[in-house]
C-alpha cells in the first residue's frame, strides 16, 4: 500500500491557495488554477467528467512564456539578429529550463497526479514539471492577463535570462535529448557522420541522428560535437511539437501499413 504524503492529502482548494501564496497573486477563477495543477493521469483515474487536465492550458502557456521571454531577450540584447535570439530563447524555454523554474516556485507538491505517476516519482519528473509550469502561465494569462504573466517571467526566469544574456547558458542538448528519449520513447539516440567536406583545417561535418530505426534529423558543424549538438537541439524541438500536438506515432515506432 502506498503511504500518502502531506502533499497527497491536500484538498484542491488548499493547493490553489498555496499556489496563490507562492506566486503572490489571486486567481479570479479557482477552477482554472486547479485545472493547471491537474495531470492527465489524475483525470483518467478519477473519471470525473467535470474535471479537466492541464494539457490545453499547457498549450496556451507555452505561447505566453515564449512571448514574454522573447520580449525580454529583445530588450536585453538590442541589435542581436533574429537567429541568435531564437537560439537564446531555446536555451531558456526548454524542458530542463522550465522544470528548473517550476522547482523554484515550488510546483511539484501542488500537482494532482494519478497513483501510477506518483509512484514513479512524477512530482520530480522534468516533463511533468515543465508541462505544469506552462499550464500555470496559461491560467495566469486567462485570469489576470498578459501583464501578470510577464511579471512572473521577470521574477522566475531572471536567472536563466541572465545566464543566456551573458553567454553562460549553453545547454547540453545531447544529454537533454537522451533523457527525454529514454523517458518518453524508451529509445537511445544514435549519431553517425554522413559526410565530411572542406579542407583539413576547416572541415564541415554532417551528422545524422537516429531514434530507433528512424533517421530523425541532420545537422552540420565545424566539429562532430557541434553537429551532434545541433541535431539533438532540432530533435528536442520536434519532440516537444509532437508531444503538444500528436498526429502520428512517436518517431522510431515501427510502422504497420495496411495492405491496399
UniProtKB/Swiss-Prot annotation:
Pfam families: dsrm (PF00035), Ribonucleas_3_3 (PF14622). The keyword Cytoplasm applies. Mg(2+) binds at residues 58, 131, 134. One of its GO terms (cellular component) is cytoplasm. It is found in: Cytoplasm. Residues 172-241 form the DRBM domain. Homodimer. This is Ribonuclease 3. It comes from Myxococcus xanthus (strain DK1622).
